[in-house]
Amino acid sequence: MAVPNELKYSNEHEWVKVEGNVATIGITEYAQSELGDIVFVELPETDDEINEGDTFGSVESVKTVSELYAPISGKVVEVNEELEDSPEFVNESPYEKAWMVKVEISDESQLEALLTAEKYSEMIGE
């Protein structure tokens, strides 16, 4: 199962890619495989503030609805609108096409609490 080294991970199976002061957030390959076929993705609006640990959306699969938890705090600067019409991208390409939001980081110290690829792999038993 893919766990890209350049990303950081949350205990709730979100991944974070940091570029400057912007973090791109999505869910991991492990998370999408546990959920099954994704049929709907609900995301926040651009300019919404999200707070670490709070829900910022949800992913609905044929099995269940799963909340998305913000791994960091900040202002949403971009939302992946393609997921509205193509939620299957979450299954097909969780680390590329299926990024969910881009957030302007408000507290960089929160990044230190995220897991490395190695630690995340251990957590999911890979």
Curated annotation (Swiss-Prot):
Organism: Staphylococcus aureus (strain bovine RF122 / ET3-1)
Subunit structure and binding partners: The glycine cleavage system is composed of four proteins: P, T, L and H.
PROSITE patterns in the record: BIOTINYL_LIPOYL (PS50968), LIPOYL (PS00189)
Record's keyword terms, sorted: Lipoyl
Stored Pfam families: GCV_H
Cofactor(s) recorded in Swiss-Prot or TrEMBL: (R)-lipoate
Protein name (database record): Glycine cleavage system H protein
Cofactor note: Binds 1 lipoyl cofactor covalently.
InterPro entries per record: 2-oxoA_DH_lipoyl-BS, Biotin_lipoyl, GCV_H, GCV_H/Fam206, GCV_H_sub, Single_hybrid_motif
N6-lipoyllysine: residues bearing it: K63
BP terms from Gene Ontology: glycine decarboxylation via glycine cleavage system
Function, in words: The glycine cleavage system catalyzes the degradation of glycine. The H protein shuttles the methylamine group of glycine from the P protein to the T protein.
NCBIfam families reported for this sequence: gcvH, PRK01202.1
GO cellular component term of the entry, any: cytosol
Family: Belongs to the GcvH family.
Gene3D superfamilies, per database record: 2.40.50.100
Domain Lipoyl-binding: 22-104
Superkingdom field: Bacteria
